[in-house]
């Protein structure tokens, strides 16, 4: 049988997290992910982050890991196609670059964050991870922005959440490199951005 869609894992949290539905399973990010983990093996592989601004909590779970759902400590983290903070060259490099950028400017333009991730440079061979795939493919996948004829980065999204008093501002920018047919197209062919405010509940 086909695996169920992973999209509902996001929409379920967004639609019912604040309401504390499912007998309290969605009350907090960590409680929700523990609920998800009970049936996590029925889905294709995923990393899932869910957060609650009022609680200042962000939690992570990967259904291809033996690690239990966990709250993230404050700081700069990274996720690639593995578990949280796996020390692959591109993750280590981009996490350091992001930290440096935020030190210089705590509110960088979203476009700058997107540009940071759209880096096609591959890692030197002596820094490549050993994941069991051919060396040529290991090289290609070591780039933050992957470009191959049959596989590549489809989109890059930057999300920023800030607060002023009881108002939370959410800003999103996205640059797409795919026309919906799974074919790589010219970089930046589709771009979109939006922002909205949310009045938060204080717990």
PLM features per residue range, with description:
Residues 1-203:
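N-terminal nucleophile
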């Amino acid at each position: 049988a086909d695996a169920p869609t992973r999209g509902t894992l996001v929409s379920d949290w967004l639609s019912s997290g604040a309401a504390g539905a499912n007998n309290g399973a969605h009350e907090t990010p960590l409680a929700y992910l523990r609920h998800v983990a009970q049936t996590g093996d029925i889905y294709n592989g995923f990393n899932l982050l869910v957060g609650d601004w009022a609680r200042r909590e962000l939690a992570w779970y990967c259904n291809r890991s033996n690690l239990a759902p966990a709250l993230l400590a404050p700081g700069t983290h990274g996720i690639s196609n593995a578990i949280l903070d796996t020390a692959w060259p591109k993750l280590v490099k981009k996490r350091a670059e992001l930290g440096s950028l935020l030190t210089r400017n705590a509110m960088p333009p979203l476009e700058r964050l997107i540009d940071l991730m759209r880096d096609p440079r591959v890692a030197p061979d002596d820094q490549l991870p050993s994941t069991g795939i051919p060396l040529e493919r290991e090289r290609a996948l070591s780039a933050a922005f992957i470009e191959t004829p049959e596989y590549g980065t489809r989109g890059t999204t930057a999300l920023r959440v800030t607060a002023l008093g009881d108002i939370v501002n959410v800003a999103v920018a996205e640059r797409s490199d795919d026309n919906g047919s799974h074919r790589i197209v010219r970089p930046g062919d589709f771009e979109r951005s939006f922002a909205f405010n949310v009045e938060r509940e204080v717990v």
